From Swiss-Prot:
This protein's UniProt keywords: Cytoplasm, DNA-binding, NAD, Repressor, Transcription, Transcription regulation
Name of the molecule in the record: Redox-sensing transcriptional repressor Rex
GO cellular component: cytoplasm
Native organism taxonomy: Bacteria, Bacillati, Bacillota, Clostridia, Eubacteriales
Subunit structure: Homodimer.
GO biological process: negative regulation of DNA-templated transcription; response to redox state
InterPro entries for the chain: CoA-bd, NAD(P)-bd_dom_sf, Rex_DNA-bd_C_dom, Tscrpt_rep_Rex, WH-like_DNA-bd_sf, WH_DNA-bd_sf
Entry annotated with the keyword Cytoplasm: yes
DNA-binding region: 17-56
Similarity comment: family membership: Belongs to the transcriptional regulatory Rex family.
Superkingdom of this protein's organism: Bacteria
Length: 211
């Protein structure tokens, strides 16, 4: 994957949406699309789309628009989807099981190869053919396998300890579902998924629309 520096986080967070819509267009056998048409589907302006894509290169042709398949391939490469990623999930409760069971991740080259939990009732069970292991085995498993991403689905009181152990095991990216902000070294990237914050935002918008 080619490195792109000084790209704003706002632009980066819009790329997955472009990727998803382009995939839908390919499934519908759409060969090309203009920035205006793409913007109408996604909810962005044509100017915004052109500015975002120009951060990564010269895409599209004036008077022609974008070749859907080519743009999808290019955005896939920008996102790093031209290689596979192995993940370890810690916490096989309701959220952990839901994440583990989501089949679309494998289509993106993202595979959960290890699942850990401290609950004896869960240890030995399988989720999509991956056996849940005792969390005490995590250190040795991380030593034996190259795990790219750690997924934290444990209670907040345990999240930092789990993050520390994942990092010691060589994990450089963490997808955090625990309702706590983790403290990690600069070289480790964290993406938080705080469900309650998303719900509170929705509740605010609901009340604003009714006032």
């Amino acid at each position: 994957m080619e490195k792109h520096k000084n790209i704003s986080m706002a632009v980066i967070k819009r790329l997955p949406k472009y990727h998803r819509y382009l995939e839908e267009l390919m499934k519908n056998e759409v060969d090309r699309i203009s920035s205006k048409e793409l913007g109408e589907k996604i909810g962005f302006t044509a100017s915004q789309i052109r500015q975002d894509l120009n951060c990564f290169g010269d895409f599209g042709q004036q008077g022609y628009g974008y070749n859907v398949k080519e743009l999808y391939t290019q955005i896939s490469a920008i996102l790093g989807l031209d290689r596979g990623y192995e993940a370890a999930l810690v916490g096989a409760g309701n959220i952990g099981q839901a994440v583990s069971n989501y089949s679309r991740f494998e289509n993106l080259g993202f595979k959960i190869t290890a699942i850990f939990d401290a609950n004896p009732k869960l240890i030995g069970m399988k989720i999509r053919d991956v056996e849940i292991m005792d969390i005490d085995e995590m250190e040795s498993v991380l030593e034996e396998h190259k795990i790219d991403i750690g997924i934290i689905c444990v209670p907040r009181k345990n999240a930092q300890v789990v993050a520390d152990e994942l990092i010691r095991g060589g994990v450089r990216a963490i997808w955090n579902f625990a309702p706590v902000d983790l403290v990690v070294p600069d070289h480790v990237k964290v993406e938080n998924v705080h469900l309650s914050e998303s719900l509170l935002t929705l509740i605010y918008l609901l009340n604003e629309s009714e006032s």
